[in-house]
Amino acid sequence: MIRIGHGFDVHAFGGEGPIIIGGVAIPYEKGLVAHSDGDVALHALTDALLGAMALGDIGKLFPDTDIQYKGADSRRLLRTAYQAILDKGYQVGNVDITIIAQAPKMRPYIDAMRTVIAQDLHCDIEQVNVKATTTEKLGFTGRSEGIACEAVALLIKQTGTK
């Protein structure tokens, strides 16, 4: 059996950088406004994984009203959510992430993001795709007011599990 989930996240720029996207620190003059570390890619991916298993969303599992998640490392949140997936007998088939930002440019960091995500999901790097695009200067991302991200996850039932 397979399951598919979709996730979306957005954060506005504010304060000072660097920013963390896909688990990778990216030098930038602005930071991201967030309760946790503001990693839109890992937040969208976490939502996609949780959605695929009908486990709600990142806000349900890690509420922003809970002080323990203030400034939280999104890699830790992703690993915790993924453990819930493994506990239900599923594993990653593949994930596909689209980062939407006018700036900063993501291309130099994409391979590192793929490596980090593959490590956290205990899968091969070939099962992780990360890409970036702009909105051609349209909307809030086009005006460099923030970053958005979408993610899709395909989960596969592990063999030998019920």
From Swiss-Prot:
It is an enzyme of class 4 (lyase). The keyword rRNA-binding does not apply. Pathway: Isoprenoid biosynthesis; isopentenyl diphosphate biosynthesis via DXP pathway; isopentenyl diphosphate from 1-deoxy-D-xylulose 5-phosphate: step 4/6. Coiled coil: none annotated. Binds 1 divalent metal cation per subunit. This is 2-C-methyl-D-erythritol 2,4-cyclodiphosphate synthase. Involved in the biosynthesis of isopentenyl diphosphate (IPP) and dimethylallyl diphosphate (DMAPP), two major building blocks of isoprenoid compounds. Catalyzes the conversion of 4-diphosphocytidyl-2-C-methyl-D-erythritol 2-phosphate (CDP-ME2P) to 2-C-methyl-D-erythritol 2,4-cyclodiphosphate (ME-CPP) with a corresponding release of cytidine 5-monophosphate (CMP). The gene is ispF.
